[in-house]
From Swiss-Prot:
Location relative to the cell: Nucleus; Cytoplasm; Cytoplasm, Cytoskeleton, Spindle; Cytoplasm, Cytoskeleton, Phragmoplast
Protein name as catalogued: 65-kDa microtubule-associated protein 1
Residues annotated with Phosphothreonine modification: 526, 543, 552
PTM annotation, UniProt: Basal phosphorylation at all stages of the cell cycle. MT-binding properties inhibited by hyperphosphorylation mediated by CDKs and/or MAPKs (e.g. ANP2, ANP3, MPK4 and MPK6) during prometaphase and metaphase.
Protein induction: Expressed throughout the cell cycle.
């Protein structure tokens, strides 16, 4: 138990004295001799001396290392201050005061700050030198991939300012060169546009970087590029001058030929792009394509063509004027005989009994009169078109009203319903349209002392016939409604007598059309026919035209709701004013 107690002393009470006392107690218990005890004590003392000695050596070594570190720091500090310049010496502490660690602690922040300044200064020098090297390469026309070497022995602000001044001069030179390049490129673009040349291929032949996709700062500014651009501009200007001279010569020839053959303005306008520059200077021609090669070739071809057509030009002019006259009459729905008119022109020109100028003047007079007549007919023709459109809607409305499924929920039914509402409103205006049309037509006939014909058919006769046929149609519809009531009466009586429920044999819809409308026949066998206002059918019913009238004249389609009648019926029917035959519009 005693040994255990000696091996477990309280750690907090261990000192050299307690350990020595403990050792004495152990020796006493063991019975060590005094010699042995002295020997062990000497051994302990020697070991303590060795420990102290090692600690002293370690401390001396650490001091030497600190001194070396301090020396290196001072040397580095001196090197940095010399490299960065005198202005960087501000804030450096006194190196000879305080302990070694204090001196190191004082130098470390300044040294770190100087290192940061050096790194920043190196980056600035590298950036400036890289820009200088790049601009010099751009001017020389070569690309250099070498990284600039920064002389770290001299990083002073003075040297940095020198580099920056050099960079500013180079940047100014680059800006001037870039401005010249852009001016040249813009000039080339304008010249290529006027000459009809491919701008992209032209500038890329000078240098690939001059295309529109390359950024401005990436365009070549080398001496060679500027020289080639200047030569290109000079070449294009010479080409522009030569082409303008050629075009002006052709324009003069064209004008002479036009004046000789009295070419109309419409044909001359086709070559306005040629004649517009007849008195322009080189600098005044700026319209894109104005001097294109194909345009000059086109003018040359036209001059050659006009030279060859001098003899036969008068016939062409006369026929063009005749076509213009026929077009005016066609738009005004006035029937003419173009074949006989053209034969007359041919005979007059071939006979040589009339001067070409007199013939053209006479045709111009006819054209003027035709325009006046067309203008006087315009109001009535516009109303005829509205009337025909209303009749078309009336025909559609009748077909719509006969449709048993018009109120179903099918796709597009609501659109037809809206159209039907608009059609009913429009159809209700037909009587007023006819009244106004009749009044204006009669006033026109009184003023001009002639019948107003629409594609050869007297308009009043058309309106009278329309009113009569509309009245007949209303009477037929009224008769069909009465017949329908008579046919449905037995079914109603049977249902009221036997049952209130609908019979399986009862018609599904009360709106079903019964009678001749359903089978395109009348109640008494009368055939329900359509009247068309085209040339063929008008010829069969018009009292103002011959039976063999021409059937090839193009006219607008007639309303599809007319009921056609034969010549004999039309001839035997009394003809009166349209107002006498107007009836209310169908619902």
């Amino acid at each position: 138990m005693a040994v255990t107690d000696t091996e477990s002393p309280h750690l907090g009470e261990i000192t050299c004295g307690t350990l020595l006392e403990k050792l004495q107690e152990i020796w006493d218990e063991v019975g060590e001799s005094d010699d042995e005890r002295d020997k062990l004590l000497l051994q302990i003392e020697q070991e303590c001396l060795d420990v102290y000695k090692r600690k002293v050596e370690q401390a001396a070594k650490s001091r030497a290392e600190l001194l070396q570190t301090l020396s290196d720091a001072n040397a580095e500090l001196s090197s940095l201050t010399m490299s960065l310049g005198d202005k960087s010496l501000v804030g450096i502490p006194d190196k000879s005061s305080g302990t070694i660690k204090e001196q190191l602690a004082a130098i470390a922040p300044a040294l770190e700050q100087l290192w940061q300044q050096k790194e920043e200064r190196v980056r600035e020098f590298s950036d400036v030198q890289s820009q200088i090297q790049k601009i010099c390469g751009d001017i020389a026309g070569g690309l250099s991939n070498e990284v600039p070497i920064v002389d770290e022995s001299d990083l002073s602000l003075k040297k940095l300012d020198d580099f920056q001044s050099q960079l500013q001069e180079l940047q100014k030179e680059k800006s001037d060169r870039l401005r010249k390049v852009l001016e040249f490129v813009s000039t080339v673009h304008d010249l290529c546009a006027v000459l009809g040349l491919d701008f992209l291929s032209t500038v890329t032949e000078v240098h690939p970087s001059l295309d529109e996709d390359t950024s401005v700062q990436s365009k070549s500014i080398s001496n060679e590029t500027l020289s080639r651009l200047a030569k290109t501009v000079l070449t294009l200007k010479d080409d522009k001058k030569q082409r303008l001279q050629k075009l002006q010569e052709l324009a003069t020839q064209l004008i002479d030929l036009w004046n000789l053959m009295d070419t109309p303005d419409e044909e001359r306008e086709l070559f306005d792009h040629v004649t517009c520059n007849i008195s322009s200077s080189v600098d005044e021609v700026t319209v894109p394509g104005a001097l294109a090669r194909d345009l000059i070739e086109q003018a040359e071809v036209e001059v050659d063509r006009l030279d060859q057509l001098k003899a036969s030009r008068m016939k062409e002019i006369a026929f063009k004027k005749q076509s213009e006259l026929e077009e005016i009459y066609a738009r005004a729905h006035v029937e003419v005989n173009p074949e006989s008119a053209r034969e007359r022109i041919m005979s007059l020109i071939d006979s040589g009994n009339v001067e070409p100028t007199e013939l053209l003047a006479d045709m111009d007079s006819q054209i003027s009169k035709a325009k006046e007549e067309a203008f006087s007919r315009k109001d009535i023709l516009d109303r005829v078109e509205k009337w025909m459109s209303a009749c078309e809607e009336e025909s559609w409305l009748e077909d719509y009203n006969r449709d048993q499924n018009r109120y179903s929920a099918s796709r597009g039914a609501h659109l037809n319903l809206k159209r039907a509402e608009k059609a009913r409103i429009l159809v209700s205006k037909i009587p007023a349209m006819v009244d106004t049309l009749v009044a204006k037509t009669r006033a026109w006939e009184e003023e001009h002392s002639m019948s107003f014909a629409y594609d050869g058919v007297p308009l009043l006769a058309m309106l009278d016939e329309y009113g009569m046929l509309r009245q007949e149609r209303e009477e037929e519809k009224r008769r069909l409604r009465e017949q329908k009531k008579v046919q449905e009466q037995p079914h109603v009586e049977q249902e009221s007598a036997f049952s209130t429920r609908p019979s399986p044999a009862r018609p599904v819809s009360a709106k079903k059309t019964v009678g001749p409308r359903a089978n395109n026949g009348g109640a008494n066998g009368t055939h329900n026919r359509r009247l068309s206002l085209n040339a063929n059918q008008n010829g069969s019913r018009s009292t103002a035209k011959e039976a063999g009238r021409r059937e090839t004249l193009n006219r607008p389609a007639a309303p599809t709701n007319y009921v056609a009648i034969s010549k004999e019926e039309a001839a035997s029917s009394p003809v009166s004013g349209a107002a006498d035959h107007q009836v209310p519009a169908s619902p």
